[in-house]
Amino acid sequence: MASILSPVPVLAAGGIADINPGLTLWTAITFLVMLAVLAKFAWGPIVKMLAERERSIREAIDSAKKERAEAERLLAAQKESLSKAQREAAELARRNQQEVEALRQELTAKARKEADELVAEARRQIAEELVKAKAELKAQVVDLAIDAASRLVKANLDEKSQRALVEEYIAQLPANRAA
């Protein structure tokens, strides 16, 4: 009974020369029959399942490659779009800077022109006022000379009296101007 429960001592006791040819033959026949049954009934579905699995894996790989290529294409398009947007923004900023500079120069030139026109107008008015003032002064001088001459003629005075009269008249001049 101990030998049935423990297979190791039995094999060790019999050795390699104790191979049973009948058992080996039946084992081989059973293996071949099972192989034939499996080949007939199971091999086709197994091969078909493996082929289907291989096809689905291949399709998944192809799909992944296509999706990767599409993602790379979209990434390149996105980079190009971003680059284009950056170029357009830089161009817009450059144009705006040029427009601002042109407007600044235009406004500066306009302000300078207006200032020059105001200065010219002021000079013209000053010149007119100067001409008017000279004309008024000339008229006053003429009036004074006529007045002085008429007083001299009326007084018909000697030289000393004439000198005193002119000095008195000159002393009255600031009073005449203020009035």
UniProtKB/Swiss-Prot annotation:
Q: What superkingdom does the record give? A: Bacteria
User: Which of UniProt's keywords are assigned here?
Assistant: ATP synthesis, Cell inner membrane, Cell membrane, CF(0), Hydrogen ion transport, Ion transport, Membrane, Transmembrane, Transmembrane helix, Transport
Q: Could you cite one Gene Ontology molecular function of this protein? A: proton-transporting ATPase activity, rotational mechanism
Q: What membrane topology was assigned to this protein in its record?
A: Single-pass membrane protein
Instruction: Indicate the transmembrane segments per the record.
Output: 27-47
**InterPro entries for the chain:** ATP_synth_b/b'su_bac/chlpt (IPR002146), ATP_synth_F0_bsu_bac (IPR005864), ATP_synthase_B_chain (IPR050059)
Q: Where found in the cell?
A: Cell inner membrane
Q: Among its keywords, does the record have Transmembrane? A: yes
Provide a GO CC annotation, any one.
plasma membrane
Report the HAMAP family cross-referenced here. ATP_synth_b_bprime (MF_01398)
Which function does this protein serve?
Answer: F(1)F(0) ATP synthase produces ATP from ADP in the presence of a proton or sodium gradient. F-type ATPases consist of two structural domains, F(1) containing the extramembraneous catalytic core and F(0) containing the membrane proton channel, linked together by a central stalk and a peripheral stalk. During catalysis, ATP synthesis in the catalytic domain of F(1) is coupled via a rotary mechanism of the central stalk subunits to proton translocation. Component of the F(0) channel, it forms part of the peripheral stalk, linking F(1) to F(0).
Subunit text: F-type ATPases have 2 components, F(1) - the catalytic core - and F(0) - the membrane proton channel. F(1) has five subunits: alpha(3), beta(3), gamma(1), delta(1), epsilon(1). F(0) has three main subunits: a(1), b(2) and c(10-14). The alpha and beta chains form an alternating ring which encloses part of the gamma chain. F(1) is attached to F(0) by a central stalk formed by the gamma and epsilon chains, while a peripheral stalk is formed by the delta and b chains.
The family annotation for this protein states:
Belongs to the ATPase B chain family.
The record, for PANTHER family, names:
ATP SYNTHASE SUBUNIT B (PTHR33445:SF1), ATP SYNTHASE SUBUNIT B', CHLOROPLASTIC (PTHR33445)
Q: What is this protein called?
A: ATP synthase subunit b
